[in-house]
Amino acid sequence: MITLQASHGRLRYLQILNKSGSTLVAILLAAGHSAAADDWLFPAEIIKEPTADRFSVCFDHTCRTIVTRSFSPGEWQRITVPLQVPAPTAAAERIAISHTIALMEQLVGEKTGTAGDRGGNLAGFGQPGQMDCIDESNNATTYLKLLQQDGLLRHHVVQNRSTRFGLFVGMPHTTAVIEDVAAPRRYAVDTWFFDNGELPVIMPLDEWKSGWRPDDDSHE
């Protein structure tokens, strides 16, 4: 049994493993009242209104490490190239968002020592600079807010993160979320499944919440 527990009475993930080490069950246990959950999912140290010259980055699982970093004007210009030409459709913009988020992760990885972050939780478990879905979803939401603030999202708005859990969807899992303003329909922007700097999953939130994983249907 492996227990990943944040400090100060925050929530805990319990992963129950079989003899081969594969995860059988993962249960999200609440410690204390809902305010404790809010502190864990939305740490107070995270900059809630980030700018390109001052934003937070979480890592080391459940945002146990939070640092402040910045993009220079030249860096910002380079990593936002996919979105600088307005996308003709929401679907095209989602593709551009995925490429932009990947570029942002690559650069942030250099700035924070998280370039070696592996997809999922187990591949890089115990190594410095690794991220779980709490780290990933906070960071992705920050990056999306930066894009929105700069007027680069023309078909979407950034929404609150979403968490899936239940008997048939596996361990609790959290993602960043955007909404197609014309549909309207919400989409998961999930950077957790793959290694740092790879294209994130962007797919309808309702499908994601049903327990989707990369070995299921294709995604954008």
Located regions from the model:
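Sec/Tat signal peptide C-region and signal peptidase I cleavage site
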Residues: 33-37
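Mid-length scaffold segments of soluble, non-membrane domains
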Residues: 96-156
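Hydrophobic/aromatic-rich core segments of domains that either
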Residues: 145-208
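Low-complexity, Gly/Ser/Thr/Pro-rich intrinsically disordered linker/tail segments
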Residues: 209-220
